[in-house]
């Protein structure tokens, strides 16, 4: 099992990172909280989780061990696959997710693409006990992570990132269009667009 990879960021295309590890390029899908911290040429350590299916093997990467643990915990919930787990971690910060579960906030969870009311309620029931220990180590701040990202096309990058979460192209375009005038960085546009869609 590959527990973590240390290497240089070779290419970025939301939400996938191509990581050069001693001359071998690993394609790793990441939540936006991790993706938006990365820059081409940067040396990084990504905590990884490998999913093996009949038709493919896919690596998922995270900036820290806690986020990886949360991802694995989400996968244990009936009906939650890697794509949905990644979408949850991309839309909600670890702190907000823990806060949401602690306070039975179904309305926040259903704003994540692909999460309906039944899935949200199942997440609440199955994660409540598992998240009690996490709640002690995190604040309940309802903010998305502070992220920095360098891109030649901030608007296009933001739209692509939102679509990778499961938002429809028109939804992503509208959300980005509503906030793009106020920001110049992709990460800021993504964060503001996500916040606007969570209202």
Curated annotation (Swiss-Prot):
It comes from Acinetobacter baumannii (strain SDF). Keywords: Cytoplasm, DNA damage, DNA recombination, DNA repair, DNA-binding. SUPFAM superfamilies: DNA helicase RuvA subunit, C-terminal domain (SSF46929), Nucleic acid-binding proteins (SSF50249), RuvA domain 2-like (SSF47781). Residues 150-199 are annotated as: Domain III. The keyword Electron transport does not apply. GO terms for biological process: DNA recombination; DNA repair. The RuvA-RuvB-RuvC complex processes Holliday junction (HJ) DNA during genetic recombination and DNA repair, while the RuvA-RuvB complex plays an important role in the rescue of blocked DNA replication forks via replication fork reversal (RFR). RuvA specifically binds to HJ cruciform DNA, conferring on it an open structure. The RuvB hexamer acts as an ATP-dependent pump, pulling dsDNA into and through the RuvAB complex. HJ branch migration allows RuvC to scan DNA until it finds its consensus sequence, where it cleaves and resolves the cruciform DNA. The keyword Transferase does not apply. One of its GO terms (molecular function) is ATP binding. This is Holliday junction branch migration complex subunit RuvA. GO terms for cellular component: cytoplasm; Holliday junction helicase complex; Holliday junction resolvase complex. Has three domains with a flexible linker between the domains II and III and assumes an 'L' shape. Domain III is highly mobile and contacts RuvB. Residues 1-63 are annotated as: Domain I. Residues 64-142 are annotated as: Domain II. It comes from the Bacteria. It is found in: Cytoplasm. Its main location: cytoplasm. Residues 143-150 are annotated as: Flexible linker. SMART domains: HhH1. Homotetramer. Forms an RuvA(8)-RuvB(12)-Holliday junction (HJ) complex. HJ DNA is sandwiched between 2 RuvA tetramers; dsDNA enters through RuvA and exits via RuvB. An RuvB hexamer assembles on each DNA strand where it exits the tetramer. Each RuvB hexamer is contacted by two RuvA subunits (via domain III) on 2 adjacent RuvB subunits; this complex drives branch migration. In the full resolvosome a probable DNA-RuvA(4)-RuvB(12)-RuvC(2) complex forms which resolves the HJ.
